[in-house]
A protein has these predicted regions:
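Catalytic micro-motifs at enzyme active sites that drive phosphoryl/nucleotidyl and oxygen chemistry
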Residues: 61-65, 74, 94-100, 176-177
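A short, N-terminal "cap"/entry segment at the start of jelly-roll beta-barrel domains
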Residues: 2-84
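Short, conserved beta-strand element in jelly-roll/cupin
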Residues: 103-117, 121, 190
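Conserved short histidine dyad/triad with adjacent acidic residue
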Residues: 86-100, 119, 171
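A short hydrophobic beta-strand segment most commonly corresponding to one strand
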Residues: 107, 183-199
């Protein structure tokens, strides 16, 4: 049985990323460069059109994808220990921005809009926040979070990334995304395989209850979202050509 174009593209990404993670434990600048060389505006249009024409691939991707509590649609294209993920923040979309870290490093490429990130650090003289410890779901239990008391943190620096920029986020680095919601923003990111342990989660405002059981997307919702993003990329392509 012949593979569809979407299956060919995803298989090609998987083969190359399998080779990368056979050698490298963490994300690095080489992985960021790989993202930049495979997910240009034109290449993204080709990929999205292929996925939208392939019901089987769309269904498989849908089973791994959901609306994240931090305000973006998380589209998991590959999950092979490492994950290749498309993140989309739609204009006007409300979001819950928490300080957090990860049990894995990742590389990220900005596909649309601009992304402002705050990098935070532990500091005895810093602002005091309520901290939670997030435990990921396992085969035996659902995800849960536990209160860990108050922790003083200090803003270390702010970075602004725009279309075409890419960067690496080390595991364990406290950060949060700032997205005012006035524009569509999208990134393609690849996360290294998850390590054992827990994640730090620090809500920025009192009373926020971080969403650890986000709603799954259904196939029609995902198709509609990808089509909307595709139309945005085509308009972006037209602007570049003009």
């Amino acid at each position: 049985m012949m593979k569809t174009k979407a299956q060919d593209l995803l298989h090609s990404y998987a083969t190359q990323l399998d080779q990368f993670f056979a050698v490298h434990q963490d994300a690095n600048t080489a992985l960021s460069d790989w993202l930049a060389s495979h997910f240009s505006n034109t290449q993204m249009i080709e990929l999205l059109e292929a996925i939208l024409k392939d019901t089987s691939s769309l269904k498989q991707i849908c089973q791994r994808s959901y609306q994240h509590g931090n305000g973006f649609l998380k589209v998991v294209l590959l999950d092979r220990g490492y994950k290749l993920r498309l993140h989309i923040w739609f204009a006007g979309q409300s979001c819950e921005e928490n300080i957090h870290d990860h049990r894995w490093s990742f590389s990220s490429l900005i596909l649309a809009g601009s992304l402002k990130s705050e990098i935070w650090k532990d500091h005895a003289e810093g602002q005091v926040f309520q901290e939670y410890e997030y435990h990921a779901a396992t085969a035996e239990r659902s995800a849960f979070k536990a209160e860990m008391g108050c922790q003083p943190l200090q803003l270390d620096h702010v970075q602004l990334n725009t279309v075409g920029d890419h960067y690496v986020m080390p595991k364990g680095k406290l950060h949060r995304i700032i997205n005012p919601g006035h524009q569509l923003v999208a990134t393609m990111m690849c996360s290294a395989p998850t390590e054992q342990g827990t994640t730090r989660l620090i809500p920025m405002h009192a009373g926020i209850d971080p969403n650890i059981q986000p709603p799954k997307a259904n196939k029609d919702q995902l198709a509609g979202a990808l089509l909307q993003f595709l139309q945005h990329l085509k308009a972006q392509e037209f602007d570049y050509a003009a």
